[in-house]
Amino acid sequence: MSTEDLNMSAATKNVLAKVRRIIPPMLESFHKGQLGRVAVIGGSENYTGAPYFSAMASARLGCDMSHVICTPAAATVIKSYSPNLMVHPLMRQSPAPNPNQDPATRDTSKDPDSDPEHISAQIIDLLPRLHVLVVGPGLGRDPLMHATVARVIRAARNRGTPVVLDADALILVQKDPGLVRGYDGAVLTPNVVEFAKLCEALKVDVSEGASETARVEALAKTLEGVTVIQKGAKDYISNGETTLTVDLQGGRKRSGGQGDTLTGSIATFLGWRKAYLDRLWDVGQNALGEHELVGLAAFGGAAITRECSRLAFAKKGRSLQASDLTEEVHVAFLNIFGEEDEETDSSRL
């Protein structure tokens, strides 16, 4: 399928042409791990699908190594979904309360599995092996889980590791905006409800009747350079300075879990961003600027997700589920970007 068949606006096609430059060629000189090592942190006793969908989208799009860091209860289930993912049962949920013990007297120093410092240290030890983190899919609202990932996010920020935050991880930003404020390697992917809660918590000043672009710009400016994707009928992406609109057609079914394809797809593009910055291939003259690449990665992930949704909806209609998007990731990539051996086709980007 050509880009014309996707009814792209000229502006969208121009941005996607830039995104295409981030995508690594398939060279024999590359070795395992150079084209993206992504970890999804989430997955709790009640939520095992979300981290799987995110990690599989990342893998299907083309990252070399896709990890899931979750609780032991979730790990067994996620491992059964796919042997292609590396699953680390390092997260812990708060222990069930003991009715015979006053919570204030509980000594967590004698129970390392209740100590967020101890738990997060094991995850932080993995950061040198990773290029990108996704935090939030299936995380839930357990306070120990939140305390743990907050420490991991700070450590990732100190290393300059990009972090994509979604779902319940956005609650952390509501409570402590300083966790990401001023970090241009952070990407937030709120839906309409989550976006409104962020704006309220951060006291974002947006006049009544303001446009969607004005709203997303205001939130991004409040967060001082964080990239925000406001998901909706169209996706609006802004870091407070540059704002992009993703207007590709998607599907009309809004089943839960589609945002997990988005986070995983963005993560792979951010992994490719590192390969691009490391000049693992000849990127040509007039290289894209480092500051621009995060927004382009977000745009690429949003475009892939919308095309996955369109393809899946065409097949499944109102029965569409999040797993149906996972099956469409590679075809969506080919439809939008093509592959190197097809670049002689002028319809490809």
From Swiss-Prot:
Cofactor(s) needed: Mg(2+)
Source organism superkingdom: Eukaryota
Location within or outside the cell: Cytoplasm
Keyword Lyase: yes
GO MF annotation terms: ATP binding; ATP-dependent NAD(P)H-hydrate dehydratase activity
Alphabetized UniProt keyword annotations: ATP-binding, Cytoplasm, Lyase, NAD, NADP, Nucleotide-binding, Phosphoprotein
Comp. bias intervals (Basic and acidic residues): 104-117
InterPro entries xref list: Carbohydrate_kinase_pred_CS, CARKD, Ribokinase-like
Location of region: Disordered: 89-117
Catalytic activity: (6S)-NADHX + ATP = ADP + phosphate + NADH + H(+); (6S)-NADPHX + ATP = ADP + phosphate + NADPH + H(+)
GO cellular component: cytoplasm
Enzyme class: lyase
The protein's Enzyme Commission number: 4.2.1.93
Disulphide bonds in the chain: none
Residues annotated as binding (6S)-NADPHX: 138, 191-197, 260
Positions annotated to bind ATP: 231-235, 250-259
UniProt keyword annotation of rRNA-binding present: no
Biological processes, Gene Ontology terms: metabolite repair; nicotinamide nucleotide metabolic process
Location of the YjeF C-terminal domain: 15-336
Protein task: Catalyzes the dehydration of the S-form of NAD(P)HX at the expense of ATP, which is converted to ADP. Together with NAD(P)HX epimerase, which catalyzes the epimerization of the S- and R-forms, the enzyme allows the repair of both epimers of NAD(P)HX, a damaged form of NAD(P)H that is a result of enzymatic or heat-dependent hydration.
Family: Belongs to the NnrD/CARKD family.
PANTHER family assigned: ATP-DEPENDENT (S)-NAD(P)H-HYDRATE DEHYDRATASE, ATP-DEPENDENT (S)-NAD(P)H-HYDRATE DEHYDRATASE FAMILY MEMBER
Protein name: ATP-dependent (S)-NAD(P)H-hydrate dehydratase
Organism: Fusarium vanettenii (strain ATCC MYA-4622 / CBS 123669 / FGSC 9596 / NRRL 45880 / 77-13-4) (Fusarium solani subsp. pisi)
